[in-house]
Amino acid sequence: MSLQATPASDAWYRSVEKTSQTDDERIKDITVLPPPEHLIRFFPISNTPVEGLISQTRKNIHNIMAGDDDRLLVIIGPCSIHDPAAALDYARRLKVVREQYKDTLEIVMRVYFEKPRTTVGWKGLINDPYLDESYRIDEGLRIARQLLIDINRLGLP
């Protein structure tokens, strides 16, 4: 949802005290993002196998780092996710390897949605999910949350 800065729609915005007359002179548009609670409620994991997987994996990692588990922690994955279908394909393949080596390795898929060192061009799935410079961050957040849950539903943390 995009709100043009109009007297009616920016009342909340103008209620913030400005420090000078030049504050925010270049703002042309304000896009409201969903609060994290909306994504959590729309994609719940409470009392699901996904929640159990995440909780158990965190305990396993803690035990490995504390020296109470002899397995090796392996965090592996692509530099940046841009294609959810390809990410799920990768996750399915990695899940097989995770099962194969579960006695010696704790394999966790690295899932990163941004391009932190990119100064020009595409900034990542969350910032530009459709690769068209539309910057639908609200959609990027939704797609990212759904993808993370889909990966976890495969049994892969």
List PLM regions with ranges:
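Short, basic, glycine/proline-bearing loop/turn elements
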Residues: 46-48, 79-80, 131-134
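Glycine-rich anion/phosphate-binding loops
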Residues: 81-101, 134-146
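Active-site-facing alpha/beta catalytic cores
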Residues: 2-23, 104-157
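Hydrophobic, well-ordered secondary-structure segments
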Residues: 4, 64-65, 86-89, 127-130
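Generic secondary-structure signature for well-ordered alpha-helical cores
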Residues: 59, 66, 95-103, 149-156
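N- or domain-start disorder-to-order transition segments that initiate the globular core
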Residues: 25-68
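Short glycine-rich or small-residue beta-strand-to-loop segments that form or flank ligand, phosphate
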Residues: 71-83, 108-112
